[in-house]
Structures are given as C-alpha cells and as structure tokens.
C-alpha cells in the first residue's frame, strides 16, 4: 500500500469545526485558538485520537498533517506540501508532532531519524542541507520533507531565534524516545542549543 504525508493549511471561522479525520492526522494552531473534543481550554495541537476539534471565538489558522493512502482523497484546504512516505516492513507506527526551537546560530549536526516527516518553519531562518545536496534556505511558512534515511545538517539564523513544527511517522517501539541518530555519535554528547516540545506521540492504525 502506497502512502503520502501531506501538509494542509486550514482557515477556520470562529467556533468552526476542524476537518473530520479520514486518516491519521495532527492539527497544529498557527494562530488563534484550537480546542480538542469537549475541552474548554486551547491547546497547541491535537492528535489522531482527538476525532473532534474546533476553533476558538476568534477563529484559527491550522496546519493539518495527514497520512493518506494513494490516490489521496480531496484535501479540503490549501495543500502546502505532499510527499510519498515509505512504510514498508514496519511492525507498527506512531504519529509524532513536536516543535524544535533553535537559539540564534544553533546547529543540528548531520543526523538521521528513524522515520520520515514534514517540517514547516514558524519563525527565523534555517539553512538545510540534505546528504550531498546544495544548502536550501527556508523562510517562515516554508515546508520540507525528510525521509529519515539521508543525513541532514541544519543551521539556524545567527541573529534571531528559529523554530519549526514537525510531524513524523516513527516506529511505535520508540514512543516517548528521541528518533534522532547522529552521523557522528560523539555529537549526541555535545552542546545542542535547541529545545524540543512534544505535543503528540500516538500509535496509529494503517
């Protein structure tokens, strides 16, 4: 079975319901308030287990990341990025949403991940180099896909903080654990001027 991961922007009016999931998905509030299920307090993100979610009284702009079978169903919003993802041979999967915050000049040394995912820059600037490719400069709103197999080097803007949101499909066996694998294992013990905030880390059924 062929799958793709896609990033969609949804603009919701005040109190409007978010898209009902037809596939495993994460919703992240870019602006405005997002409320999951019967909750009365806003949350940064909701995961696949939250079947109902809606915007707050001022509306909301959401990033929706879905894992869809090919051919994909209608998106129902503005598709910012869609990329095939290889899920062959897995014994079980989870959907993870986290935010990565770099201090000015922060660097993520060459690394891989245990699964693929989509990233979207929220603020700052990030120079991303995948394998032997040319560096790519990503600005706020820019999205990219990492398979997890190729080594990636990321360098944040020197003059300001940089942040991106990430939704990835990881082996279920690493729930609650980091997915990162450094090309040079010594980098794992060196200073890392960046912070991770995990919002969603839920098993999914394909």
Q: Language model features by range: what are they?
A:
Residues 22, 48-78, 148-177:
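Ligand-binding loop in jelly-roll beta-barrel domains
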Residues 84, 141-143, 185-190:
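Short amphipathic alpha-helical linker/capping segments at the junctions of internal repeats
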Residues 22-36, 113-128, 164-171:
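Short, conserved beta-strand element in jelly-roll/cupin
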Residues 175-206:
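Acidic/histidine-enriched, glycine/proline-rich intrinsically disordered or flexible terminal extensions
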Residues 9-13, 26-56, 102, 130-151:
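Short acidic-glycine-tyrosine-enriched beta hairpin
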Residues 96-143:
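A contiguous binding-surface segment within folded domains or other stable secondary-structure elements
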Residues 17-21, 108-113, 130, 155-157:
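Short histidine-centered beta-strand/loop micro-motifs
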Residues 1-25, 30, 65-68, 75-106, ...:
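A short glycine-rich, His/Asp/Glu-containing loop-to-beta-strand
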């Amino acid at each position: 079975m062929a799958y793709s991961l896609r990033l969609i922007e949804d603009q919701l009016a005040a109190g409007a319901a978010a898209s009902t999931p037809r596939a495993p998905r994460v919703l992240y509030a870019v602006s405005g308030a997002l409320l999951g299920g019967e909750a009365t307090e806003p949350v940064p993100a909701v995961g696949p287990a939250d079947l109902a979610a809606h915007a707050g009284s001022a509306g909301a702009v959401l990033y929706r990341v879905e894992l869809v079978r090919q051919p994909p169903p209608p998106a129902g919003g503005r598709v910012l990025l869609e990329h095939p993802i290889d899920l062959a041979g897995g014994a079980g999967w989870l959907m993870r949403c986290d935010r990565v915050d770099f201090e000015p000049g922060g660097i993520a040394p060459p690394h891989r991940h245990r699964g693929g995912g989509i990233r979207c820059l929220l603020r700052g600037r990030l120079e991303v180099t995948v394998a032997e490719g040319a560096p790519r400069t990503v600005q706020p709103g820019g999205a990219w896909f990492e398979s997890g197999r190729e080594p990636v080097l990321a360098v944040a803007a020197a003059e300001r903080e940089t942040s991106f949101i990430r939704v990835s499909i990881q082996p279920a066996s690493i729930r609650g654990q980091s997915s990162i694998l450094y090309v040079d294992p010594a980098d794992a013990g060196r200073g890392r001027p960046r912070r991770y905030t995990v919002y969603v880390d839920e098993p999914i059924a394909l």
